[in-house]
UniProtKB/Swiss-Prot annotation:
GO terms for cellular component: ASAP complex; cytoplasm; nuclear speck; nucleoplasm. The gene is rnps1. Keywords: Cytoplasm, mRNA processing, mRNA splicing, Nucleus, RNA-binding. Residues 45-101 have a biased composition (Low complexity). Component of a splicing-dependent multiprotein exon junction complex (EJC) deposited at splice junction on mRNAs. The EJC is a dynamic structure consisting of a few core proteins and several more peripheral nuclear and cytoplasmic associated factors that join the complex only transiently either during EJC assembly or during subsequent mRNA metabolism. Putative component of the spliceosome which enhances the formation of the ATP-dependent A complex of the spliceosome. May participate in mRNA 3'-end cleavage. Also mediates increase of mRNA abundance and translational efficiency. This is RNA-binding protein with serine-rich domain 1. It is found in: Nucleus; Nucleus speckle; Cytoplasm. Belongs to the splicing factor SR family. Residues 137-216 form the RRM domain. It comes from Danio rerio. Component of the active spliceosome. GO terms for molecular function: RNA binding.
Length: 283
């Protein structure tokens, strides 16, 4: 006999009920275990941070549904990465915004050095503009022969201008012979330039000479030497010291009584004289 369709329906309805009854105690046991886990975690993490609380909530939600746990983990990872990136960006911005004191000092030194160099250059340029370099009025003549004298140089170089001074050092051993060079100083720099153009490489006494311009040295006053302070002579040693002035004064000499001379009679002297003369005559 085939079962009736009504019985089949009843059986099919009874099966899901039984399955629901079986699932209900399993769900209750799982919920109890979850509650116990939550209590334990709360006790252990009573002094924990907000991060531990969020992790406990995420773990409880992950037990209920795997999809929600994966979403929370991804969101927490993204939040961590975002916080780390924000902290890095803030640190980099802080470091870039406020440089270290050593860098500041280095930058200040560079700026001061560059300023000092630029100031020096400008000062030098201003000095050059204010005081132009003086033109030379003195010439150095080299490679002169020993036959050339002061008078020869005077005759030759006086044609180019008025000569102020001629210096021709002579040899020590031979005072009438020059050392082979001389100095000629003109009153105006134009005359000196003219003589330099014509006589540099010219010939005197059959020999080619050299002429070069020289700036005349300014005679500077010699610096005054401060006389050293006079030092008192050191005191003589104790054994050489003279007595004080009071002792130097010689006391008035004591009056001594005149020595009494013994009065002698002249007779004994005469006798002696006579005796001596008599003795001499007898001899």
């Amino acid at each position: 006999m085939a079962p009736s369709p009504t019985k089949r329906r009843e059986r099919s309805e009874d099966k899901p009920r039984e399955r629901g009854k079986e699932k209900a105690p399993a769900k209750e046991g799982a919920e109890k275990e979850r509650g116990r886990d939550k209590i334990r975690k709360r006790r252990s993490n009573s002094t924990g941070s907000s991060s531990s609380r969020s992790s406990s909530s995420s773990s409880s939600s992950s037990g209920s549904s795997s999809g929600s746990s994966s979403g929370s983990s991804s969101s927490s990872g993204s939040s961590r990465s975002g916080s780390s990136s924000s902290s890095r960006s803030s640190s980099s911005s802080g470091s870039s915004g406020s440089p270290s004191p050593s860098r500041r000092r280095h930058d200040n030194r560079r700026r001061s050095r560059s300023k000092s160099k630029s100031q020096k250059r400008t000062d030098e340029k201003e000095r050059k503009r204010r005081s132009p370099s003086p033109k030379p009025t003195k010439l150095y003549l080299g490679r002169l022969t020993r036959n050339v004298t002061k008078d020869h140089i005077q005759e030759i170089f006086a044609t180019y201008g008025k000569i102020k001074m001629i210096d021709m050092p002579s040899d020590r051993l031979h005072p009438n012979v020059s050392k082979g060079y001389a100095y000629v100083e003109y009153e105006s720099p134009e005359d000196a330039q003219k003589a330099l153009k014509h006589m540099d490489g010219g010939q005197i006494d059959g020999q080619e000479i050299t002429a070069t311009a020289i700036l005349a040295q300014r005679i500077r006053p010699a610096p005054r030497r401060l006389s050293p302070p006079r030092r008192m002579p050191p005191p003589p040693p104790m054994w050489r010291r003279t007595p004080p002035r009071m002792r130097r004064r010689s006391r008035s000499p004591r009056r001594r009584s005149p020595v009494r001379r013994r009065s002698r009679s002249r007779s004994p002297g005469r006798r002696r004289h006579r005796s001596r003369s008599s003795s001499n005559s007898s001899r």
